[in-house]
Swiss-Prot record:
<feature type="binding site">
    <location>
        <position position="263"/>
    </location>
    <ligand>
        <name>(6R)-5,10-methylene-5,6,7,8-tetrahydrofolate</name>
    </ligand>
</feature>
<comment type="similarity">
    <text>Belongs to the thymidylate synthase family. Bacterial-type ThyA subfamily.</text>
</comment>
<feature type="binding site">
    <location>
        <position position="51"/>
    </location>
    <ligand>
        <name>(6R)-5,10-methylene-5,6,7,8-tetrahydrofolate</name>
    </ligand>
</feature>
<comment type="pathway">
    <text>Pyrimidine metabolism; dTTP biosynthesis.</text>
</comment>
<protein>
    <recommendedName>
        <fullName>Thymidylate synthase</fullName>
        <ecNumber>2.1.1.45</ecNumber>
    </recommendedName>
</protein>
<dbReference type="GO" id="GO:0005829">
    <property type="term" value="C:cytosol"/>
</dbReference>
<feature type="binding site" description="in other chain">
    <location>
        <position position="177"/>
    </location>
    <ligand>
        <name>dUMP</name>
    </ligand>
</feature>
<dbReference type="GO" id="GO:0032259">
    <property type="term" value="P:methylation"/>
</dbReference>
<feature type="binding site">
    <location>
        <begin position="126"/>
        <end position="127"/>
    </location>
    <ligand>
        <name>dUMP</name>
    </ligand>
</feature>
<dbReference type="InterPro" id="IPR023451">
    <property type="entry name" value="Thymidate_synth/dCMP_Mease_dom"/>
</dbReference>
<keyword id="KW-0489">Methyltransferase</keyword>
<feature type="binding site" description="in other chain">
    <location>
        <position position="21"/>
    </location>
    <ligand>
        <name>dUMP</name>
    </ligand>
</feature>
<dbReference type="GO" id="GO:0006235">
    <property type="term" value="P:dTTP biosynthetic process"/>
</dbReference>
<dbReference type="Pfam" id="PF00303">
    <property type="entry name" value="Thymidylat_synt"/>
</dbReference>
<dbReference type="InterPro" id="IPR020940">
    <property type="entry name" value="Thymidylate_synthase_AS"/>
</dbReference>
<keyword id="KW-0963">Cytoplasm</keyword>
<dbReference type="InterPro" id="IPR000398">
    <property type="entry name" value="Thymidylate_synthase"/>
</dbReference>
Amino acid sequence: MKQYHDLCRHILDQGVVKEDRTGTGTTSVFGYQMRFNLQEGFPLITTKKLHIRSIIHELLWFISGETNVRYLQDNGVRIWNEWADEEGNLGPVYGSQWRSFPRPDGSSVDQLAQVIEQIKTNPDSRRLIVSAWNPGQLEEMALPPCHLLFQFYVADGKLSCQLYQRSADTFLGVPFNIASYALLTHMVAHVTGLEVGDFVHTLGDAHIYHNHLEQVELQLSRDPRPLPKLNIVRDVSSIESFRFEDFEILGYDPHPHIKGEVSV
């Protein structure tokens, strides 16, 4: 995927050295955008192998509204373990905000359900937005949302999605985020009777941690391979009804995995 390689090279060539919350140190740029035509293939990075199981199960977990890591652990996904408390709780993170964003009167808003209904009934709306950024609950969250707001757009029978990500760990996180929101776009398009359009990924602080510099150079030395295809194997009518087994990734032929440590 040339778009991702261009981002990595841009950070290495134009970035500034910044300190960060974890103490690792980063090279960073501010403000960057990538666009992926989902008709041309499913945007899974091919210059290193990604753990597809984690991508799918994490998104299903978000959609369920769950905020305890037990479901993830039961399905062999460990990516949230570092932030969970002893009981596995993370506080009101992504799934909570997507499915039960609190109102001042104590009730809540199911943002995802509302947006899907609006796509069906008012597809030209400019309010097809889901936000995970809730200033009143940030201190209760194990980790404030990095990918914090997404907006859908319908044109010519196709559904596009734009994500705003305030903080982007370019080596470990961004490939995962691209695939996750591309998958979400496919899922929402499926339940609303639309084709997929573009996924637009807008980054705020896009950075490479200094303990990932060698890995990024290795990845950039590899030639991208053709993108795989995503196939949804079952007719699903509601976003909550999707299961892991409903997705096939066809033709994914990546280069070997490149290990990198997570900065917590």
